């Protein structure tokens, strides 16, 4: 049986934390900021953790990532 390979697009979008979680960056941050409030823009700058419902699926895609 062949080895499971890392999904390269996912590996570029997620980072593994020291405690084993997955960190992600938020969507809607590339353009059209004039329609967003300062508070929205400030919160979009922060990274967040992957939700538990998505964690198992994403973890299998980036299983070889350190």
Swiss-Prot record:
GO terms for molecular function: structural constituent of ribosome. Pfam families: Ribosomal_L35p. Keywords: Ribonucleoprotein, Ribosomal protein. It comes from the Bacteria. InterPro entries: Ribosomal_bL35, Ribosomal_bL35-like, Ribosomal_bL35_CS, Ribosomal_bL35_sf. GO terms for biological process: translation. Residues 1-16 have a biased composition (Basic residues). GO terms for cellular component: cytosolic large ribosomal subunit. SUPFAM superfamilies: L35p-like. Residues 1-20 are annotated as: Disordered. PANTHER family: 54S RIBOSOMAL PROTEIN BL35M, LARGE RIBOSOMAL SUBUNIT PROTEIN BL35M. Belongs to the bacterial ribosomal protein bL35 family. This is Large ribosomal subunit protein bL35. The gene is rpmI.
